[in-house]
Amino acid sequence: MSSYPPHEVAQRLASGLLSFPVTHFRADLTFDEPAYREHIGWLGQFGAAGLFAAGGTGEFFSLTPAEVETVVSAAVREVPDGLPVIAPAGYGTAMAVELARAAERAGAHGILLLPPYLTEADQEGLAAHVRAVCAATGLGVILYSRANAVYTETTVARLAEDCPNLVGFKDGVGDIERMTRLYARLGDRLTYVGGLPTAETFALPYLELGVTTYSSAMFNFVPRFALDFYDAVRRRDHAEVRRRLNDFVLPYCDIRNRRAGYAVSIVKAGMKVIGRPAGPVRSPLTDLDDAELAMLADLVKSMPATGEA
């Protein structure tokens, strides 16, 4: 598997759509590595710019540290050569450092630094957290701003100066002014990633703020649609983006919004619909009920044949 310096990884990620695969579980909720590796191989043929193993869509929050390393290692072994694998780090600082080092052992090419777990902190504390993780690894680090870890442009600018391997910023907040200020201040110093749930919804307006890529969960089960949507965004084809939003993305969001936590559950449901089941979600998430699954199946089947499977 090839290795790349941090800024080359960032450039690769900025050049195309990002794959966030689900993590496959058996009925007893143990990790189904053979099924997961088969899925990673299948996704690899569609040409994403990067693969984020065991991320939010991959139920990072329900995996043990040992499982995270196993999942990342499985992805690294299965992706086609040239496709960067990004591993997660999160929770408290000590755990995040441990996970970053585990990512290196597993052969990952970069780190997605998720928010600390269940704690509030000021900007100085958040900055210290990021510095510690960046100092612990030679891999490029992408900072995920969301929930209880929302970074100001001043903090990010200081971190970008202090941490050469801080190479990306993923936005999970949706504050246009904050993103405008960040991009105006840092420009091309970072790669900017759209990270709101069902990021396709916001992809076109975010493109004007320097956000050239985003995390696509639906790439798991409608990869050609996801890539065609991304291409329409990059072309700034407003009519095509609007059509695809109305035909699929927004109705999909309507199902997703029926219950909290469905941003992950609906992706595994989509896998089931296309005949590539990935097993249940782990608690505290819940799977779609039969009626919701039928709604999603009808939506997927209403789309023109795209050769997904």
From Swiss-Prot:
Gene Ontology terms for molecular function: 4-hydroxy-tetrahydrodipicolinate synthase activity; 5-dehydro-4-deoxyglucarate dehydratase activity
Pathway: Carbohydrate acid metabolism; D-glucarate degradation; 2,5-dioxopentanoate from D-glucarate: step 2/2
UniProt feature coiled coil, ranges: none
GO biological process entries: D-glucarate catabolic process
Top-level EC class as recorded in UniProt: lyase
InterPro entries named in the record: Aldolase_TIM (IPR013785), DapA-like (IPR002220), Dehydro-deoxyglucarate_dehyd (IPR017655)
Entries under SMART domains matching the protein: DHDPS
Enzyme Commission number(s): 4.2.1.41
Record keywords, A-Z: Lyase
PANTHER family on file: 5-DEHYDRO-4-DEOXYGLUCARATE DEHYDRATASE 2-RELATED, DIHYDRODIPICOLINATE SYNTHASE
Name this polypeptide is given: Probable 5-dehydro-4-deoxyglucarate dehydratase
